[in-house]
Amino acid sequence: MLKLIPVFLLLLASCSAGNLESRHSSDLESRRIRRIAVLPPADSGPRPRIGTPPGEPRPPDRDPDEILARLLYPALSALPNWQIVSESEVREASQGISDADEATRLRRLGEAVYADAVLVGRMSRYRERVGDEWGAKSPASVSFVLRLVDVRRGDVIWSANFDETQKSLSENIFVIGSIGERGVRWLSADQLANDGVKRAVGQLHQLIARVS
């Protein structure tokens, strides 16, 4: 039990905003994170095609983790005062380490591209809406976790958890705050995930920019 105490102390600072929760290490300033790479998903082979009954949410044709990585790059690159390793450089560097376990892949990748930290994303739920943006029989539902890992020490220094199933204003009056950004419409799963990614990355940027 005592071994867990140092980790707990590093994660005292936390933030919650509705469907997005994040935590960061209390010594983030001393880490001097300047250059960040995104860990590409491990290649698990072709995804099986699964039949879906009419009117039910269709599973994505793409790997949900690939979808998340694709959304992360523009969100990260759009913000100043940090360096984001390009996707092409990351994929080239990761070709020779794809068979290693995640911790080894992360460390080797970070060292290969001279990154201070590596961002790891995992999509745990990606369910598309049934219907269109003006009338959905079933809303989009997305859940993902982001972890920023210090390459040198190998520990998690920031994490974010996004979990949302879109609700109408009549179901939840608290969604009124997002109407100005999203409008009164039903989002696709991509749009919902992108909204969560931008918010999470924005929180991370405030922390990194603040200590840079």
Where are each of the predicted segments found?
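Sec-dependent bacterial lipoprotein signal peptides
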Residues: 1-15
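A structural "domain/chain start" motif
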Residues: 15-92, 197-212
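A short, structured loop/turn motif at beta-sheet edges
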Residues: 32-34, 110-118, 148-158
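Extracytoplasmic/secreted cell-surface and envelope-processing proteins
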Residues: 48, 128-133
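Second-shell loop/turn segments in exported
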Residues: 54-63, 93-97, 133-134, 182-187
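Short, solvent-exposed, polar/charged sequence segments at loop or secondary-structure edges
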Residues: 79-129
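Hydrophobic core residues within well-ordered beta-strands of beta-rich domains
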Residues: 117, 140-142
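Short secondary-structure boundary motifs at beta->alpha junctions and helix caps
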Residues: 137, 150-201
